Amino acid sequence: MVGNSQWQSIRKDRIGDPILIDDKTLLQMANDVRKNAYCPYSNFPVGAAILCSDGTVFTGVNVENAVNGLSICAERTAIFKAVSEGHHDFVKLAVTCKGDHCQPCGACRQVIYEHAPEIEILMGNPEGKFVRTTIRDLLPEAFSL
């Protein structure tokens, strides 16, 4: 399942082979979905796209609320959509926002780590620039029970 209907043909062509979804495509999917963000308080739209091992991609955006604690980030939206559809094996996460490159917040880092401790993360911007890292680099001392 892909969060943006324009990518349906890509999903069908590439399902089962996540290697065929390159970094630029995943970043573009994250960037394209940014327009759906609900961010009237920060005016800071963020988009995310998470690639599953079977080639399925889930997208997410930040959704704000007047009570900030009830807001959710794009990264967690994408992960929770995937998990709610039965996907648990994640390969790569792309996140985009305006500025130099977009970094996941601390809460997102913990959620990402718990669901995919080996995941690669692409932190990008609308101009196509990005930084490649891993969740272990971003959160070397993750909390665990």
Give the residues covered by each predicted segment.
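Feature captures the catalytic cores and cofactor-binding loops of soluble hydro-lyases/lyases
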Residues: 77, 81-85
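C-terminal binding/interaction regions
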Residues: 2-36, 85-145
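Amphipathic coiled-coil signal-relay and dimerization helices
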Residues: 58-60
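Short Gly/Pro-enriched turn/cap motifs at secondary-structure boundaries
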Residues: 38-41
